[in-house]
Amino acid sequence: MTATASASSVSGSLGRNELPPHLDENLLTPRFYTTEFDKAAKTDLEIARRDFQAMFNEMEADYNLKHFDRKASLARLNELSPKDKSVYESYLVRSVVSEFSGFLLFKEISNRFKKAKRPELGQFFQFLARDEARHAGFLGRALKEEGINIDLPNLPKKRAATFFPLSWVLYSLYLSEKIGYWRYILINRHLKAHPDKACAPLFDFFEPWCQDENRHGDCINMMMRCWPGMTKGFRGKILSRFFLWTVFLTHTLTVCERGDFYELLAIDPVKFDEEVIIQTNNTSKNAFPWVYNFEDGRFLEMRKEILNAFRSWRKASKLSKPIHFLKFVSLIARQFALPMEKTQAVRYS
């Protein structure tokens, strides 16, 4: 569906837990999060003082400020078919909700740090919130060019926030930023090699965008190191396994279920998904105590079976749905249990 709505009409027509145009309620829908803010305020920064100061200075410098031209046109350059137009709009909507979700979480963490008299950490997370707001703003402008205005400030009021413990938030945030980095940089490299496939100037901003994502991931890694218990022993291994598996599974289902966006850019969604997962798993060796071992190829090979089972489950009749669901769960459980390898990630203590 190609939706055109004003901010007021979107805001006025959506009830609680209803979604903007191009979003359906399912397991892959972007969400808003909350966490243990009081616990986060107790972060022991002194064990990471040198790294923190270096990252603080880098974030304060805001190297990408001039790379995001707020006056640049974000209108599509190419005429798209109604189907492709809907595909492009759907990508923008999902992306703007994800970026705005990150902004809200970072902003709330920043505010809580300041209230707890932790001004350095408060300012640090304000820098992260600044970047996420900038990204959401650019995506919002691109949507307006398509005739879609989403009332972002009111959207969280219509969506129940999901609570995650602090350790879950840090693991998932790290992966979210790093997988975002690899997604943006791979798309950017592809479009530089095939400029005729860049249907809008929005893609010109993907290079500084991916730099922000990479930097944010490093910031979250530093925060994880301030909580050594999160990455030690059995707890560190199970958290590494769970979040790598969850993020990779979600990425596979999201990319392949919405492969028409990547095909619009002349990108093979299956190969793109594989490369993003490989690179993110490798990058995670710098933060997590354990990562998946891809040497025997089983983890990556199972994606096709899992995707087919997922599609069969969603398309199945009411009577056969439980059978298809059990097959899907069996496959993802087998993938979850595949071998991992220990990393040499730096620890403060």
Curated annotation (Swiss-Prot):
Return the Pfam families for the record: Rubrerythrin
Positions of the UniProt region annotated as Disordered? 1-22
Q: Which UniProt keywords apply?
A: Chlorophyll biosynthesis, Iron, Metal-binding, NADP, Oxidoreductase, Photosynthesis
Give the first-level EC class, as a single word: oxidoreductase
Tell me the route in metabolism or biology where this protein functions: Porphyrin-containing compound metabolism; chlorophyll biosynthesis (light-independent)
> What are the required cofactors?
Fe cation
Which InterPro entries has this protein been placed in? AcsF, Ferritin-like_SF, Rr_diiron-bd_dom
Catalytic reactions on record: Mg-protoporphyrin IX 13-monomethyl ester + 3 NADPH + 3 O2 + 2 H(+) = 3,8-divinyl protochlorophyllide a + 3 NADP(+) + 5 H2O
Where does the source fall among the domains of life?
Answer: Bacteria
Output the Gene Ontology terms for molecular function: iron ion binding; magnesium-protoporphyrin IX monomethyl ester (oxidative) cyclase activity
**UniProt-listed Enzyme Commission number(s):** 1.14.13.81
**Gene Ontology BP term (one):** light-independent chlorophyll biosynthetic process
In terms of PANTHER family, this protein maps to: MAGNESIUM-PROTOPORPHYRIN IX MONOMETHYL ESTER [OXIDATIVE] CYCLASE, CHLOROPLASTIC (PTHR31053:SF2)
Q: What does this protein do?
A: Catalyzes the formation of the isocyclic ring in chlorophyll biosynthesis. Mediates the cyclase reaction, which results in the formation of divinylprotochlorophyllide (Pchlide) characteristic of all chlorophylls from magnesium-protoporphyrin IX 13-monomethyl ester (MgPMME).
Family indicated by similarity: Belongs to the AcsF family.
Task: Return the protein name.
Answer: Magnesium-protoporphyrin IX monomethyl ester [oxidative] cyclase
Gene from which this protein is expressed: acsF
